[in-house]
């Protein structure tokens, strides 16, 4: 797997909150979250949609970016969501 293939993503959950994570394969990770095999948070508050915040980075950079996103306020995450790349399944 390419070392510069990691992405930071936001998931909009059914409670209108955002869940942030990283993955080298966001589509596969969304499937895991959707089927209850992802994070505990997304097992409780089901995913509605996912968007890529940043991509094409190594794992360490992705982890640092994830931490930065998690420190944002809800309003800042909403703004980031609006600017983020839509997933092919989102129309």
From Swiss-Prot:
InterPro entries tied to this protein: GIY-YIG_endonuc (IPR000305), GIY-YIG_endonuc_sf (IPR035901), UPF0213_domain (IPR050190)
Gene3D superfamilies: GIY-YIG endonuclease
PANTHER family noted in UniProt: UPF0213 PROTEIN YHBQ (PTHR34477:SF1)
Domain GIY-YIG: 4-83
Pfam families per record: GIY-YIG
Matching CDD domains: GIY-YIG_UPF0213
Family: Belongs to the UPF0213 family.
Source organism (scientific name): Neisseria meningitidis serogroup B (strain ATCC BAA-335 / MC58)
PROSITE patterns the record matches: GIY_YIG
SUPFAM superfamilies hit by this protein: GIY-YIG endonuclease
Full protein name: UPF0213 protein NMB0361
């Amino acid at each position: 797997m390419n070392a510069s293939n990691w992405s930071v993503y936001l998931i909009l959950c059914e409670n209108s909150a955002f869940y942030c994570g990283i993955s080298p394969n966001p589509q596969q990770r969304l499937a895991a979250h959707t089927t209850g095999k992802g994070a505990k948070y997304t097992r409780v508050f089901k995913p509605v949609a996912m968007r890529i915040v940043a991509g094409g980075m190594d794992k360490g950079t992705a982890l640092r970016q994830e931490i930065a996103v998690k420190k944002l306020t809800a309003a800042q995450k909403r703004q980031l969501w609006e600017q983020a790349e839509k997933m092919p399944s989102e129309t």
